Every structure is written in C-alpha cells, then in structure tokens.
Amino acid sequence: MGDCFENILRTASSLKLREPVIDTVIRFSEDMCRWLLHLHLKLGTDIEVITVGGNHDTQRLLESRPTFEDENLTKFVVAYMKQRYEGIIGVDINDYQDIAIKNIRGTNIMFCHGEDKDLSTTMDYFSNLYNVDIDEGYGGHLHRPESKAIGITEVGDRMFTRVGSIVGIDTFAKKIRVAARPSVYVALYTDNGKTWGRNYYL
C-alpha cells in the first residue's frame, strides 16, 4: 500500500533515518524477496505481488511538495523483485502502479495508497476510468486500521479497508492525533467474496 520508506520528505525526516535512503531501499528489496520466497514455500501456493507507491516513497527533488509523483522509490523495489524472481515459477511480480485493480475469486478489488479524503469518490473515479465495477478497496496512509461500508455490490457491502502500518505511530500520526499499534492485515477470499479478515499486531 505504499510508504515502504521514510525517505526525506522534510528536514525533520533526516532525524529519523538510521542509514542513507538508498541503502534502505536495497535492504528492504532484499528482505521482501526473502520473505516472499518463505511465504511461497510455507503456503505451497502461487503468489502474485501487487505493489503501489505511497507519498513517503515519492522523491521531493526541487520543492517541499511531491510535484514529481512518478519519481517513486517503490519502482526500485519492483524492479529488484522482478530481477530476483525472473524464471522462478510460482511468484509473479506485477509492474509498479499508482493504483491497481485485481479480480480475486470473482471480487474486483482496488489497491491504492489511500491519501484521498473521500475514498468512495476515488473508487467511483477508477471504476469509470477503467470501466470495471469495483467491489472493495484497500489502502493505508493513516497508520491505523479501519473499515467503512460505502455502498452495496453483488457480493455484499462495498467496503474500503484501511490497513495499519508496520511502523505504527510516527510524528505525522501524533500531529493528526491518531494512534495504533504496528500491524498487518490478512484477508481470505473464496468464490463467495471475502470470508475472513484479521489484523495481526506486531
């Protein structure tokens, strides 16, 4: 869901960095490759990897605002994973995207970073842009998990789920007065749609 890295978004960001950003990108890319291989072998099933960028991954090269949103460090992660998994059967690395829409067991799911305030409008926009009915959406950005019903579909309520952050609370979270433990979200889909979902706290 993006925000793989702290990056240097503002001067205060440099206080949080434990190593150069590029070194973090390389280490994170390798860690993801090892984790995906372990997951693939442990579950004994094929894995499709969908990666979208976030605002923290964007390079702010000339100004304080991320005017060059295509300058995203997550593209390096995707390129690295594609290189590592080239020719390996069972792990499919999708191209980098700012948003992705995938059909999982008959449910059309949108994956985005989630920085928009009105996520219902975001889902409607991309439904119209790509001419596909989006049943559910996933995003992050706010560093806390929450789910919201924003309509109905053939497979049930049209839900948007914000997933938590593996970082948990940071200075931005404190500034906007939100707090949540570091977490990841896992969901199970069958032909009847999403049948199970859970936050795992780290």
Predicted regions and their residues:
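Acidic carboxylate-rich catalytic motifs and surrounding loops in phosphoryl-/glycosyl-chemistry enzymes
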Residues: 47-55, 91-100
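Active-site beta-strand termini and strand-to-loop segments that position acidic
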Residues: 102-106
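Conserved beta-sheet core of the metallophosphoesterase superfamily
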Residues: 71, 75, 81-86, 95-96, ...
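Core catalytic region of metal-dependent phosphoesterases/phosphodiesterases
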Residues: 1-81
